[in-house]
């Protein structure tokens, strides 16, 4: 455990951020699974709609600092390729 007051505060804020980021990442994974499920079912409209939602959330995660911009770009392009194959 840290002895310095500011470091004790940083430990608390880091824990809050970690929990927030984990819940956000979990939501992203769920959206990505929904896109994959829509692609598997062959429903192009549903796949396109869920892809749009997932892309927005991925961009938001980048702006909030949850994901690196290249990670989000790779995920978005991979999902777009899957949807385009339908």
Swiss-Prot record:
GO BP, one annotated term: translation
Gene Ontology CC: cytosol; small ribosomal subunit
Sorted UniProt keywords: Ribonucleoprotein, Ribosomal protein, RNA-binding, rRNA-binding
One GO molecular-function entry: structural constituent of ribosome
Pfam families xref list: Ribosomal_S20p
Functional summary from the UniProt entry: Binds directly to 16S ribosomal RNA.
Family: Belongs to the bacterial ribosomal protein bS20 family.
Protein name (record): Small ribosomal subunit protein bS20
